[in-house]
Amino acid sequence: MSTVIPKIALGAWSWGAGAAGGDQVFGNHLFEEELKPVFEKAMECGLNLWDTAAVYGEGTSERILGNFVKDVRRNSVILSTKFTPQIAGNSPDAMQKMIDVSKERLHTDVIDVYWIHNPMDAPKWTPDLIPLAKSGQIKTIGVSNHNLAEIKRANEILAAEGLKVSAVQNHYSLLHRSSERAGILDYCKENEITFYSYMVLEQGVLTGRYSEENPFPEGTGRG
């Protein structure tokens, strides 16, 4: 059963370290000591949808968020995480194994929003969301980094079992408007799908933090 999800999510991509972590991607060094006040202030302001992924920081992002979640009422926070095909392996229960690890890190039995992180072999993986939804392990299904045809295909697969894509998360900003030009925003509006933009400020480029004179830290993925 789909849950009502807010229009604003707070991302935890840059939390923690390691491959796909904040240090290697952005040059950040953000751990629990720095992030706990951010979590507490956001929750105080009513911002309670937290978005992470199994791959972020090789799991450290989920672990940090999970440690914060332990200190609040579970129904006061909405947890969003992702199945990343590239680290899944080939076992028939790969998605179940990945979500089990995510649930353990996040200290929860239920994931409020569960995404297929990118479209690599998405038609193969999308059907595996169905038993997770029907068993109550996930409440809402999302797809990330999918083009319009891939979103429609995911919806077709899910619709056969009475389910649907309820959220799309793509790179979108004033500098990167492919989802708009491709008709994804219109499709989401027409089908009551919540669209989430990530990198909406281009990690500080649009706020003036980074420029040719002040680039991302050398050696990082963004640099």
Label each region the model flagged.
Residues 10, 35, 42, 50, ...:
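Conserved, mostly hydrophobic/aromatic
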Residues 119-223:
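Beta/alpha (TIM)-barrel catalytic core signal, keyed to glycine-rich beta->alpha loops juxtaposed to Asp/Glu
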Residues 1-77:
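N-terminal binding-site loop/beta-alpha segment at the start of enzyme catalytic domains
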Residues 2-5, 44, 66-76, 100-107, ...:
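Acidic (Asp/Glu)-rich catalytic clusters
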Residues 27-42, 89-107, 122-127, 148-155:
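Short, acidic/polar
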Residues 53-62, 86-91, 117-124, 148-149, ...:
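Acidic-and-aromatic substrate-binding clefts and catalytic sites of carbohydrate-active enzymes
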Residues 75-87, 114-117, 169-172:
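A short, structured active-site edge motif that brings together acidic residues
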Residues 17-23, 85-90, 206:
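A short acidic, helix-capping loop that chelates divalent metal ions and anchors anionic groups
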